[in-house]
Amino acid sequence: MSKRTIVDANTFFGFYPRRKVDSSLEALLQIMKENGVSKALTLSLKGVFYSYEEGNEETLRVCKNHRNLMPVATLDPRRFLGGRSEIESLLELGFKAFRLFPDVQGYPLNYSPVIEIFNCLDGLKAPLLISVGGRGDITAVSKLTCGKDFPVIIVGCFYSNLSEFIVSARKNKNLYVETHHLASPDSLEVLVNKVGADRIIFGSGTPLEYFQASYMMV
């Protein structure tokens, strides 16, 4: 039997200011090694809590030294003025995907700079991971990205808003869901039955979250 290839779409490294946790690069690499994770999309937490430009520089530097890490560029709409050229430059540097954190950085989804980022990504086919919070967020993301030509991966979907994702995903064929908060086996079964296994992206949130909690559900 061939060994399962594990790719984790949701990992981090760097200092996390909200609670005491070992979120160092070394911790991430050790968790990947212990659990047989072949590749991981990752980003520096500096880009989330401090400067997204400095965070992206650190992400790229680290990923160049570790071939099992794939760089994700953080974008902060509160400071984003570079337009499509900035996003194209990040892709040329080697970034594989983009990430928005409205839940952490405190901006609404129906926000002109966010809409500008969605428009800039259209046609580039690079995935966008976006964290959601309360009810209605998935609906808003789906409406704002429907018809655009890039994959949108919803991060932070719970069982309680699974129906919102399913209804939205039926209308928006570029919508996918990441798994780290889907903590019950039935949620994955429901997703497979309603939208198909190809719309489910494995992510753990490690090292901020416990890897096995996500992995055992898949």
Language model regions located:
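Catalytic pocket-lining loop regions of alpha/beta-barrel enzymes
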Residues: 97, 110-202, 209
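A general structural detector for well-ordered alpha-helical segments in enzyme core domains, enriched
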Residues: 24-31, 55-62, 86-90, 113-117, ...
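Active-site gating/metal-coordination segments in enzymes
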Residues: 39, 47-129, 171
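Alpha-helix N-cap/helix-start motif
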Residues: 18-21, 52, 83, 110, ...
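Structured loop/turn residues at beta-strand edges in well-structured enzyme cores
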Residues: 4, 35, 67, 93, ...
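Active-site beta-loop-alpha junctions enriched in small/polar residues
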Residues: 10-16, 45-47, 74-78, 101-105, ...
